[in-house]
Amino acid sequence: MFKEFKEFAFKGNVLDLAVAVVMGAAFNKIITSLVTYIIMPLIGLIFGTVDFAKNWSFMGIKYGLFVQSVIDFLIVAFALFLFVKLANTLMRKEEVEEEPEENIVLLTEIRDLLQQQNGTVTNETTNIFTETDDVDNKKF
C-alpha cells in the first residue's frame, strides 16, 4: 500500500499540481497586496475617501470590501489568463520546432531521389505513404 501511494505521490502530474498550488497561493498574496495597498488607495483618492474599502458601507453591509475583493479577483484572473496563454504559445512553438524522426528524413530523401531519377512527379509518388500511414500503430 505504501508503494502504491509513493508511486502516486511522486508522479509528475501530482508534483506539478502541488507546485502550482503553492505558486498560486504566493501569487495571490502579491496580487492582494497590490490591490489593498496600491490600487484601492488610488480609487479612494478619486472618490474622496482615504480608505475606500472600509468606509463604503450601508447599514453594516461593507460593499467597499466586496468591491475590493472583486477587483482582486479580476486582476488574479487576468494575470492567470495571460500566464496560461503564454504557456500555451510556448508549448505550440516547442511542438512545431520538433525535428522529424530520422526514418522520416531518410524516407523523404529516398522519395525525392526516386522522383529525380524518374523525372516526373505524380500525385501517387507524393502520397506514397498515405495508405501505409498506420502500420503497426506507428506513424511514418
Curated annotation (Swiss-Prot):
Disulfide bonds: none annotated. GO terms for molecular function: mechanosensitive monoatomic ion channel activity. The chain crosses the membrane at residues 7-27, 30-50, 64-84. The keyword Methyltransferase does not apply. Its main location: membrane. It is found in: Cell membrane. Keywords: Cell membrane, Ion channel, Ion transport, Membrane, Transmembrane, Transmembrane helix, Transport. One of its GO terms (cellular component) is plasma membrane. InterPro entries: Mechanosensitive_channel_CS, MS_channel, MSC/AndL, MscL_channel. PROSITE patterns: MSCL. Pfam families: MscL. It is a multi-pass membrane protein. It comes from the Bacteria. Belongs to the MscL family. Homopentamer. Channel that opens in response to stretch forces in the membrane lipid bilayer. May participate in the regulation of osmotic pressure changes within the cell. This is Large-conductance mechanosensitive channel. It comes from Staphylococcus carnosus (strain TM300). The gene is mscL.
